[in-house]
UniProtKB/Swiss-Prot annotation:
Residues annotated for AMP binding in this entry: H133, V134, S135, L223, I224, V225, S226, R227, Q228, N229, L230, H231, V232, S233
Keywords: Hydrolase, Lyase, Mitochondrion, Nuclease, Nucleus
Name used for this protein in its record: U6 snRNA phosphodiesterase 1
Biological processes annotated in GO: U6 snRNA 3'-end processing
Quaternary data: Monomer.
Lineage top rank: taxon: Eukaryota
Gene encoding the protein: USB1
Enzyme Commission number(s): 4.6.1.-, 3.1.4.-
Residues forming the catalytic site: H133 (proton acceptor), H231 (proton donor)
Phenotype upon loss of function: Lethal.
Length: 290
Protein backbone atom coordinates (compact mmCIF):
# COMPACT_ATOMS: atom_id res chain seq x y z
CA UNK A 1 0.00 0.00 0.00
CA UNK A 2 2.84 2.39 0.76
CA UNK A 3 4.22 1.87 -2.74
CA UNK A 4 0.82 2.56 -4.28
CA UNK A 5 0.43 5.66 -2.12
CA UNK A 6 3.84 6.88 -3.18
CA UNK A 7 2.94 6.41 -6.82
CA UNK A 8 -0.30 8.36 -6.44
CA UNK A 9 1.37 11.18 -4.58
CA UNK A 10 4.00 11.45 -7.30
CA UNK A 11 1.31 11.55 -9.97
CA UNK A 12 -0.55 14.32 -8.17
CA UNK A 13 2.61 16.37 -7.97
CA UNK A 14 3.33 16.06 -11.68
CA UNK A 15 -0.23 17.00 -12.56
CA UNK A 16 0.06 20.11 -10.43
CA UNK A 17 3.28 21.11 -12.15
CA UNK A 18 1.70 20.46 -15.58
CA UNK A 19 -1.33 22.60 -14.75
CA UNK A 20 0.81 25.47 -13.52
CA UNK A 21 2.97 25.23 -16.63
CA UNK A 22 -0.09 25.34 -18.90
CA UNK A 23 -1.46 28.36 -17.03
CA UNK A 24 1.80 30.24 -17.47
CA UNK A 25 1.87 29.45 -21.21
CA UNK A 26 -1.71 30.67 -21.62
CA UNK A 27 -0.89 33.84 -19.72
CA UNK A 28 2.17 34.50 -21.92
CA UNK A 29 0.17 33.89 -25.08
CA UNK A 30 -2.59 36.23 -23.85
CA UNK A 31 -0.03 38.91 -23.08
CA UNK A 32 1.49 38.62 -26.58
CA UNK A 33 -1.93 38.92 -28.23
CA UNK A 34 -2.74 41.96 -26.12
CA UNK A 35 0.51 43.63 -27.17
CA UNK A 36 -0.15 42.90 -30.84
CA UNK A 37 -3.68 44.31 -30.61
CA UNK A 38 -2.37 47.45 -28.93
CA UNK A 39 0.27 47.82 -31.64
CA UNK A 40 -2.35 47.38 -34.38
CA UNK A 41 -4.62 49.97 -32.82
CA UNK A 42 -1.81 52.50 -32.59
CA UNK A 43 -2.04 55.17 -35.33
CA UNK A 44 1.03 55.25 -37.58
CA UNK A 45 2.39 58.53 -38.89
CA UNK A 46 1.11 59.63 -42.31
CA UNK A 47 3.29 58.94 -45.35
CA UNK A 48 4.85 62.17 -46.64
CA UNK A 49 3.57 63.45 -49.98
CA UNK A 50 7.09 63.46 -51.38
CA UNK A 51 7.31 59.69 -50.89
CA UNK A 52 3.87 59.11 -52.42
CA UNK A 53 4.69 61.19 -55.50
CA UNK A 54 8.04 59.46 -55.91
CA UNK A 55 6.65 55.90 -56.03
CA UNK A 56 3.16 56.52 -57.44
CA UNK A 57 2.55 55.05 -60.91
CA UNK A 58 -0.47 56.58 -62.66
CA UNK A 59 -2.75 54.20 -64.67
CA UNK A 60 -2.19 54.11 -68.42
CA UNK A 61 -5.53 55.35 -69.74
CA UNK A 62 -4.23 56.03 -73.24
CA UNK A 63 -4.21 52.34 -74.11
CA UNK A 64 -8.01 52.34 -74.05
CA UNK A 65 -8.04 55.07 -76.68
CA UNK A 66 -6.07 52.89 -79.11
CA UNK A 67 -8.01 51.47 -82.03
CA UNK A 68 -7.17 47.85 -81.24
CA UNK A 69 -8.63 48.16 -77.76
CA UNK A 70 -11.89 49.52 -79.15
CA UNK A 71 -12.23 46.60 -81.55
CA UNK A 72 -13.30 44.33 -78.69
CA UNK A 73 -16.83 45.75 -78.95
CA UNK A 74 -17.19 44.25 -82.45
CA UNK A 75 -18.27 40.72 -83.36
CA UNK A 76 -15.60 39.15 -85.54
CA UNK A 77 -15.68 36.67 -88.40
CA UNK A 78 -13.35 35.38 -91.09
CA UNK A 79 -13.98 33.25 -94.20
CA UNK A 80 -11.49 30.74 -95.61
CA UNK A 81 -10.77 27.31 -97.10
CA UNK A 82 -9.04 24.89 -94.74
CA UNK A 83 -6.18 22.60 -95.76
CA UNK A 84 -4.83 19.79 -93.60
CA UNK A 85 -1.58 18.68 -95.26
CA UNK A 86 -0.44 15.07 -95.00
CA UNK A 87 3.01 14.16 -93.59
CA UNK A 88 4.27 13.81 -97.17
CA UNK A 89 3.09 17.35 -97.96
CA UNK A 90 4.71 18.53 -94.72
CA UNK A 91 8.07 17.37 -96.06
CA UNK A 92 7.53 19.21 -99.33
CA UNK A 93 6.56 22.41 -97.51
CA UNK A 94 9.59 22.09 -95.26
CA UNK A 95 11.77 21.72 -98.35
CA UNK A 96 10.35 24.97 -99.73
CA UNK A 97 11.13 26.80 -96.50
CA UNK A 98 14.65 25.38 -96.35
CA UNK A 99 15.33 26.35 -99.96
CA UNK A 100 14.17 29.89 -99.26
CA UNK A 101 16.43 30.10 -96.21
CA UNK A 102 19.37 28.79 -98.20
CA UNK A 103 18.88 31.40 -100.92
CA UNK A 104 17.85 34.51 -99.02
CA UNK A 105 18.86 34.14 -95.39
CA UNK A 106 22.65 33.95 -95.49
CA UNK A 107 24.36 35.45 -92.49
CA UNK A 108 26.96 37.53 -94.34
CA UNK A 109 26.68 41.21 -93.52
CA UNK A 110 27.00 42.08 -97.22
CA UNK A 111 23.84 40.15 -98.12
CA UNK A 112 21.11 42.76 -98.82
CA UNK A 113 18.37 40.11 -98.53
CA UNK A 114 19.23 38.93 -95.04
CA UNK A 115 16.04 38.10 -93.12
CA UNK A 116 15.17 36.71 -89.75
CA UNK A 117 14.23 33.07 -89.41
CA UNK A 118 10.87 31.65 -90.52
CA UNK A 119 8.75 29.36 -88.34
CA UNK A 120 6.46 26.84 -90.10
CA UNK A 121 2.74 27.34 -89.60
CA UNK A 122 1.74 23.74 -90.30
CA UNK A 123 3.49 22.33 -87.20
CA UNK A 124 3.21 23.54 -83.62
CA UNK A 125 6.22 24.04 -81.34
CA UNK A 126 5.40 20.64 -79.80
CA UNK A 127 5.38 18.91 -83.20
CA UNK A 128 1.60 18.57 -83.60
CA UNK A 129 0.17 19.12 -87.12
CA UNK A 130 -1.82 22.32 -87.68
CA UNK A 131 -4.25 23.16 -90.50
CA UNK A 132 -3.46 25.81 -93.09
CA UNK A 133 -5.99 28.07 -94.79
CA UNK A 134 -6.67 30.15 -97.88
CA UNK A 135 -8.14 33.47 -96.76
CA UNK A 136 -11.18 34.52 -98.79
CA UNK A 137 -11.85 37.67 -96.74
CA UNK A 138 -10.00 39.94 -94.42
CA UNK A 139 -10.99 40.16 -90.77
CA UNK A 140 -14.71 41.00 -90.67
CA UNK A 141 -16.04 43.27 -87.91
CA UNK A 142 -19.78 43.39 -87.24
CA UNK A 143 -21.43 45.96 -85.00
CA UNK A 144 -23.96 43.44 -83.65
CA UNK A 145 -24.07 39.71 -83.19
CA UNK A 146 -27.23 39.62 -85.31
CA UNK A 147 -25.29 41.06 -88.26
CA UNK A 148 -22.76 38.26 -88.04
CA UNK A 149 -25.53 35.68 -87.76
CA UNK A 150 -27.15 37.09 -90.92
CA UNK A 151 -23.82 36.93 -92.77
CA UNK A 152 -23.21 33.27 -91.91
CA UNK A 153 -26.79 32.32 -92.78
CA UNK A 154 -26.54 34.11 -96.12
CA UNK A 155 -23.31 32.23 -96.81
CA UNK A 156 -25.22 28.98 -96.33
CA UNK A 157 -27.98 30.15 -98.65
CA UNK A 158 -25.53 31.33 -101.30
CA UNK A 159 -23.61 28.05 -101.38
CA UNK A 160 -26.87 26.12 -101.63
CA UNK A 161 -28.39 28.33 -104.34
CA UNK A 162 -25.24 28.23 -106.48
CA UNK A 163 -24.97 24.46 -106.06
CA UNK A 164 -21.29 24.59 -105.18
CA UNK A 165 -19.69 21.14 -105.38
CA UNK A 166 -16.30 19.90 -104.08
CA UNK A 167 -13.28 20.68 -106.23
CA UNK A 168 -9.48 20.45 -106.10
CA UNK A 169 -7.59 23.68 -105.50
CA UNK A 170 -4.15 23.85 -107.12
CA UNK A 171 -1.33 25.63 -105.27
CA UNK A 172 1.81 27.05 -106.86
CA UNK A 173 4.97 25.58 -105.34
CA UNK A 174 7.04 28.77 -105.75
CA UNK A 175 6.88 30.83 -102.53
CA UNK A 176 6.28 34.56 -102.13
CA UNK A 177 6.44 36.99 -99.25
CA UNK A 178 3.18 38.47 -97.98
CA UNK A 179 2.92 41.38 -95.59
CA UNK A 180 0.25 41.50 -92.89
CA UNK A 181 -2.46 44.16 -92.75
CA UNK A 182 -0.76 45.83 -89.80
CA UNK A 183 2.55 45.91 -91.70
CA UNK A 184 4.59 44.37 -88.90
CA UNK A 185 4.70 40.71 -89.94
CA UNK A 186 5.91 38.84 -93.00
CA UNK A 187 4.57 35.50 -94.15
CA UNK A 188 6.07 33.02 -96.56
CA UNK A 189 3.20 31.74 -98.68
CA UNK A 190 2.28 29.78 -101.78
CA UNK A 191 0.00 31.52 -104.31
CA UNK A 192 -3.16 29.83 -105.50
CA UNK A 193 -2.80 28.92 -109.18
CA UNK A 194 -5.04 31.45 -110.88
CA UNK A 195 -5.85 29.98 -114.31
CA UNK A 196 -6.76 26.36 -113.39
CA UNK A 197 -8.95 27.49 -110.47
CA UNK A 198 -10.68 30.49 -112.06
CA UNK A 199 -13.98 28.75 -112.79
CA UNK A 200 -14.20 27.19 -109.30
CA UNK A 201 -13.21 30.30 -107.33
CA UNK A 202 -15.20 32.99 -109.17
CA UNK A 203 -18.62 32.17 -107.60
CA UNK A 204 -17.29 32.62 -104.07
CA UNK A 205 -16.62 36.33 -104.58
CA UNK A 206 -20.26 36.89 -105.53
CA UNK A 207 -21.58 34.74 -102.66
CA UNK A 208 -19.45 36.51 -100.05
CA UNK A 209 -20.25 39.96 -101.46
CA UNK A 210 -24.01 39.33 -101.30
CA UNK A 211 -23.76 37.91 -97.77
CA UNK A 212 -21.79 40.93 -96.54
CA UNK A 213 -24.14 43.35 -98.26
CA UNK A 214 -27.24 41.73 -96.72
CA UNK A 215 -25.61 41.80 -93.29
CA UNK A 216 -25.22 45.58 -93.51
CA UNK A 217 -21.48 45.94 -94.26
CA UNK A 218 -21.00 49.04 -96.41
CA UNK A 219 -17.37 48.57 -97.52
CA UNK A 220 -17.79 44.88 -98.33
CA UNK A 221 -15.85 45.10 -101.61
CA UNK A 222 -12.66 46.07 -99.75
CA UNK A 223 -12.97 43.07 -97.43
CA UNK A 224 -12.88 40.36 -100.11
CA UNK A 225 -9.46 39.01 -101.11
CA UNK A 226 -8.97 39.26 -104.88
CA UNK A 227 -8.35 36.12 -106.87
CA UNK A 228 -4.81 37.31 -107.70
CA UNK A 229 -3.90 37.55 -103.98
CA UNK A 230 -5.23 34.20 -102.80
CA UNK A 231 -2.46 32.19 -101.13
CA UNK A 232 -1.59 29.72 -98.39
CA UNK A 233 0.77 31.02 -95.70
CA UNK A 234 3.22 28.26 -94.72
CA UNK A 235 5.68 30.16 -92.47
CA UNK A 236 5.88 33.36 -90.45
CA UNK A 237 8.88 35.65 -89.94
CA UNK A 238 10.02 36.44 -86.43
CA UNK A 239 10.27 40.22 -85.92
CA UNK A 240 11.40 41.34 -89.39
CA UNK A 241 13.18 44.67 -89.62
CA UNK A 242 11.49 47.76 -91.05
CA UNK A 243 13.92 47.72 -93.97
CA UNK A 244 12.89 44.17 -94.81
CA UNK A 245 9.20 45.06 -94.64
CA UNK A 246 9.75 47.94 -97.07
CA UNK A 247 11.58 45.87 -99.67
CA UNK A 248 9.52 42.67 -99.53
CA UNK A 249 8.23 43.32 -103.08
CA UNK A 250 11.83 43.54 -104.30
CA UNK A 251 12.55 40.27 -102.52
CA UNK A 252 9.60 38.65 -104.29
CA UNK A 253 10.86 39.70 -107.72
CA UNK A 254 14.37 38.43 -107.04
CA UNK A 255 13.14 35.23 -105.45
CA UNK A 256 10.77 34.44 -108.31
CA UNK A 257 13.49 34.90 -110.90
CA UNK A 258 16.02 32.71 -109.08
CA UNK A 259 13.65 29.89 -108.18
CA UNK A 260 12.15 29.70 -111.65
CA UNK A 261 15.64 29.69 -113.15
CA UNK A 262 16.75 26.81 -110.94
CA UNK A 263 13.45 24.94 -111.40
CA UNK A 264 13.70 23.52 -107.89
CA UNK A 265 10.01 22.84 -107.36
CA UNK A 266 8.61 20.86 -110.26
CA UNK A 267 5.91 19.03 -108.28
CA UNK A 268 2.31 20.20 -107.97
CA UNK A 269 0.40 20.87 -104.78
CA UNK A 270 -3.37 20.56 -104.56
CA UNK A 271 -6.02 19.71 -102.00
CA UNK A 272 -9.73 18.93 -101.98
CA UNK A 273 -12.07 21.76 -101.03
CA UNK A 274 -15.46 20.46 -99.90
CA UNK A 275 -16.49 23.16 -97.43
CA UNK A 276 -16.00 26.77 -96.43
CA UNK A 277 -15.28 28.02 -92.91
CA UNK A 278 -16.66 31.08 -91.13
CA UNK A 279 -15.25 32.00 -87.74
CA UNK A 280 -17.28 33.23 -84.79
CA UNK A 281 -14.53 34.81 -82.70
CA UNK A 282 -12.51 31.67 -81.79
CA UNK A 283 -15.16 29.17 -82.90
CA UNK A 284 -15.07 27.83 -86.47
CA UNK A 285 -18.27 27.01 -88.34
CA UNK A 286 -17.91 24.55 -91.22
CA UNK A 287 -20.38 24.94 -94.09
CA UNK A 288 -20.16 21.87 -96.38
CA UNK A 289 -20.88 22.03 -100.10
CA UNK A 290 -23.76 20.13 -101.70
Amino acid sequence: MEFISADYSSSDGSDTESESSNKSEVQIEYTEKTCIQKADSTDLPAIPDSIILKYHIPPNLQKYEHQDMNMSRFWRSFTYFEWRPTPAIHRQLQKIICKYKETFMKQEYTNPYQLVDFDPLFISHLGAPKPLHVSLTRSLLFETEEQRHVFIQEMRNGLRNNEITPFKLQICSYPKLYISERANTLYLGLPVSECPNKAQISPFKTIIAEALQKSGISNYQDLIVSRQNLHVSIAIASNPSKATLKRYQQLNETMGALLLLNNDFAYKLEFLVNSIYCDENRHSIRIPFN
